[in-house]
From Swiss-Prot:
Main localization category: secreted
Source organism, top-level taxon: Eukaryota
Name of this chain's protein: Subtilisin-like protease SBT3.10
Residue intervals of the PA domain: 390-464
Localization in the cell: Secreted
Keyword Lipid biosynthesis: no
This protein's GO CC annotations: extracellular space
Species of provenance: Arabidopsis thaliana
Record InterPro entries: Peptidase_S8/S53_dom (IPR000209), Peptidase_S8/S53_dom_sf (IPR036852), Peptidase_S8_His-AS (IPR022398), Peptidase_S8_Ser-AS (IPR023828), Peptidase_S8_subtilisin-rel (IPR015500), Peptidases_S8_3 (IPR034197), S8pro/Inhibitor_I9 (IPR010259), S8pro/Inhibitor_I9_sf (IPR037045)
Propeptide: 26-108
């Protein structure tokens, strides 16, 4: 009977909903983008938004019910709940640039700074010269912050910069007057667009705090990686022990919570957070957020972070963003606009070897984050029935086959938690998983889960098959760091080329993003408020921390100058001089589509010698060069813009890289460099051409003095290939013996244009 009632009620609800849908059209959240604001008074901007909605909806009450956000600082626009027909009507108003549906974004996730050479050291170290980042303000758009973490204590801080116009909002378990301090100077949260799209947050289904407080720890981890205070004797399950700190321990942090557990990040909320951050006076914006391909063009307001970033950069605020976690597949990058600093993820010179000793006394070193007691010699098994040795199929085995034993399995694809769950449910004592390297280690305190590659896994399998009673001993993980551990681009890190504009190299730079130890909220799996996380989300704040230090030392540098300094001084080998590899289905030498300019080298970036600088006008010319229409460019700028005729070449955009996706015959391009090193300098060119490609630079020498700080040069590139090829890579370096200003060169020959080759 109860089932009948439930089904009847469900059926009636469907019928009623269908009937209502004929009467009331469904409202959705739309972003109405108006471009550059016409008033300096934010209240006047908001009033103009209300007037526009009033003309459409007919009453003040309807306007207040509809409007979600007013964007009134970095640009003009608003988010509102509208029906499809209302959105169409408002899009036809002459002052409206574009009306777009709301979009959703995802979050991407001790030793790091020493590995990169950013150590307190002596008075000549980068940290000391940059005064730890004091007086610089970084804005972090993420899941919020856990303010009680000691990483956010303000001991030794002076006053908050007088230019700061932001504040701290109170909310659930967050008191703005108590939880903010001279380090954590700002905390706001944005959920209106998320609520408008999905309904009011149901905390039973989606546990979170209606405040800037961080529930899952992602935002806390990011913020503490950028600027966490010094905290000694920190570890995770006993591993990675050392002094934890952020890259710029003296920076002021402003947190903007726009991402919510299980509901992601509403584009309209993120855009509002960016608008507020611009108004509040942040010096840098850090976004560990991603979308997935296919992407929208940079001039399309549906690419909300790109549009918001453009307005931030136009006001001198560098925007650092994650490359995405869809690797190792090519063309999977997000945040690809040329004005954004896009970050890939690498490992570092630290690993967690875990000794596996077989009954024949052979010891194999796997990788794990296992902090439990040593597992003495116990039974070892590999399920031999068809497919059941597959990690995804372990649950198909009888529990008796795994109970009381360590299980070996093979994973053909990225491993999931299914294998761990199956073994634990069967009463198994541990799991050895043979797989391609992904660097994603699941931390477990009392259950050994150890990863090995297929070769070592096969060795273990041969041992199992060679004896009637195979046994194994697994020791607790240890921490190993130093030159014996090489650097690799992480498997998950998204790869180029750029799917929107292939002549724009992405990613720009790489930084450690694997097993990064930082603060986290106590709601998550942690050890004393700290945890290891991996992702381009974790690499992004590493770069943001370096940008803070550069901004402290060079407050007059533009966002493009900072990007240039980082890209042109990057390591193309790891700090120990070993080649950097890129992990994937097979391991290969890393190239610019894996790591951009290379692995970030903070100490060198401070004194790059030369920079490839750009202004907002250069970005406008870029938009013209890739055939975006005058109308779409005008939408971004908020003012009428007419591209020159003929249009400029995208290859002439003054990037610290050269990427030619469709070379046929010969092409000539131009770059301009600005001297920021010794006044009287002479640089000579060194060319490492891509295979089968000729590169000639004119002039081959650049002379700078007190009256000449800028020099232009041309690059003539021609191919000797007679067929369509893949990309080949090289470099172009200007050197004065003190500085080596290197940019990557990526060239693909396309005899048949716009041709996709399956072979």
């Amino acid at each position: 009977m109860s089932k009948t009632i439930i089904l009847l009620a469900f059926f009636l609800s469907i019928v009623l909903n269908v009937q209502i849908s004929f009467v009331v059209a469904e409202s959705k959240v739309y972003v109405v983008y108006l471009g550059e604001k016409e008033h300096d008074n934010p209240e006047s901007v908001t009033e103009s938004h209300h007037q526009m909605l009033w003309s459409l909806l007919g009453s003040k009450e309807a306007v207040l019910d509809s409007i979600v956000y007013s964007y009134r600082h970095g640009f003009s626009g608003f988010a509102a709940k509208l029906t499809e027909s209302q959105a169409q009507q408002i899009s036809e108003l002459p002052e409206v640039v574009q009306v777009i549906p709301n979009t959703l974004y995802e979050m991407t996730t001790t030793r790091t700074w020493d590995y990169l050479g950013v150590s307190p050291g002596n008075s000549d170290s980068l940290l000391q010269k940059a005064n730890m980042g004091y007086n610089v303000i970084v804005g972090v758009i993420d899941t919020g912050v856990w303010p009680e973490s000691e990483m956010f204590n303000d001991k030794g801080y002076g006053p908050i910069p007088s230019r700061w116009k932001g504040g701290c909002e109170s909310g659930e378990l967050f008191n703005g007057s108590i939880h903010c301090n001279r380090k954590l100077i700002g905390a706001k949260y944005f959920i209106d667009a998320n609520n408008a799209q999905f309904g009011v947050l149901n905390k039973t289904e989606n546990p979170d705090y209606l405040s800037p407080r961080d529930f899952n720890g992602h935002g806390t981890h990011v913020a503490s990686t950028i600027g966490g205070s010094f905290l000694p004797n920190v570890s995770y399950l006993g591993l990675g022990r050392g002094t934890a700190r952020g890259g710029a321990p003296g920076v002021h942090i402003a947190v903007y919570k726009a991402c919510w557990v299980q509901r992601g990040c509403s584009g309209a909320d993120v855009l509002k957070a960016m608008d507020e951050a611009i108004h509040d006076g942040v010096d840098i914006l850090s976004l560990s957020l991603q979308t997935s391909v296919p992407l929208f063009p940079e001039t399309d307001a549906r690419e909300l972070t790109s549009v918001g970033a453009f307005h931030a950069v136009a006001k001198g605020i560098p925007v650092v963003a994650a490359a995405s976690n869809a690797g190792p597949t090519a063309q999977t990058l997000s945040n690809v606009a040329p004005w954004v600093l896009t970050v890939a993820a690498t490992t570092q010179d630290r690993s967690f070897p875990t000794a596996i000793t077989l009954g024949n006394n052979i010891t194999i070193l796997g990788q794990a984050i296992f902090g439990g007691s040593e597992l003495g010699f116990v039974g070892l098994t590999y399920p031999e029935s068809p497919l059941s040795g597959d990690c995804e199929k372990l649950s198909a085995n009888p529990k008796s086959a795994m109970e009381g034993k360590v299980v070996l399995c093979f994973a053909a694809s990225t491993p999931s938690n299914a294998a761990i769950t199956a073994v634990i449910n069967a009463g198994g004592l541990g799991l050895i998983m043979a797989r391609n390297p992904t660097h994603l280690l699941r931390p477990l305190r009392n259950f050994p889960y150890v990863s090995v590659d297929f070769e070592l896994g096969t060795d273990i399998l041969f041992y199992i098959r060679s004896t009637r009673s195979p046994i194994v001993n697994i020791q607790a993980s240890r921490t190993l760091f130093g030159q014996s551990v090489s650097t690799k681009v992480a498997t998950f890190s998204s790869r180029g080329p750029n799917s929107v504009s292939p002549a724009i190299l992405k990613p720009d730079i790489a930084a450690p993003g694997v097993n990064i130890l930082a603060a986290i909220s106590p709601n998550s799996i942690n050890d004393g408020g700290f945890a290891m996380m991996s992702g381009t989300s974790m690499a992004t704040p590493v770069v943001s921390g370096v940008v803070v230090l550069l901004k402290s030392l060079h407050p007059d540098w533009s966002p493009s100058a900072i990007k240039s300094a980082i890209v042109t001084t990057a390591w193309r080998t790891d700090p120990s001089g070993e080649p950097i590899f890129a992990d994937g289905s097979s391991r290969k030498l890393a190239d610019p589509f894996d790591y951009g300019g290379g692995l970030i080298n903070p100490e060198k970036a401070v004194k790059p010698g030369l920079i490839y600088d750009m202004t907002t006008d250069d970005y406008v010319m870029y938009m013209c060069s890739v055939d975006y229409s005058d109308i779409s460019i005008s939408r971004v700028l908020g003012k009428i813009t007419v591209c020159p005729n003929p249009k400029p070449s995208v290859l002439d955009l003054n990037l610290p890289s050269i990427t030619i996706p469709n070379l046929r015959g010969e092409v000539t391009l131009t770059r301009t460099v600005t001297n920021v090193g010794p006044v009287n300098s002479v640089y000579k060119v060194v060319i490492d051409p891509p295979t089968g490609v000729n590169v000639a630079v004119t002039p081959t020498e650049l002379v700078f003095d007190s009256t000449t700080t800028k020099r232009s040069f041309t690059v003539r590139v021609s191919t000797t290939h007679k067929v369509n090829t893949g990309y080949y890579f090289g470099s172009l370096t200007w050197t004065d013996t003190l500085h080596n200003v290197a940019i990557p060169v990526s060239v693909r020959t396309q005899i048949l244009q716009r041709y996709y080759d399956e072979n």
